[in-house]
Amino acid sequence: AYVLKDTVMDILNETKADKVNIIAHSKGGLDARYMISSLGMAEYVASLSTISTPHNGSITMDNILKLPNILIKIGAKLADVWFKILGDENPDTYKVINQFTTIATKKFNENNKDCSNVYYQSFAFVMKNPLSDFLMFLPNIIVSLFEGENDGLLAPRATKWTNFRGIYRGNSKRGISHLDEVDLRRYKLSSQRGD
């Protein structure tokens, strides 16, 4: 949230605009809400659109965190390795999953109310089946057991927030996964070198 605040101020200074419109994905939506509500940035933000942000927490996380803590820590360390491969320089999956429980997000929501001068909207996405995205195969199955349809990490129930715009399923047989939402695979395959 602090990095986002600095980035917003840099953009406003560079462009001389009065406000920004923010589109935030996943936990970035919570960071943006915190920045707006708790870091005094409401006057600089016209709108916040959140894409699969866990506003209401994950029932799946509530259940997973009932497992023995050693298993959770091992799983989190393995996830950290994966996130490093994907480009996160300093992942802390164990800390993050504890922030995504329904209890933690309820407290977060109580402390970070919407600001009346900012327009908020939220969007949910779902995969059509576990084979829709091989990287989200296992998480999709696990989340499905506890919460039904999901994007590989979050069920629509978790992402609903102010001005909820609905569940997007895509036109293909695949649906839309948590990674598709940020075009992760295409970005990696289409990056150019040498310029």
Question: Where do the PLM segments sit?
Answer:
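Helical cap/lid subdomain of alpha/beta-hydrolase-fold lipid enzymes
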Residues: 42-195
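N-terminal non-catalytic accessory region
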Residues: 1-69, 189-191
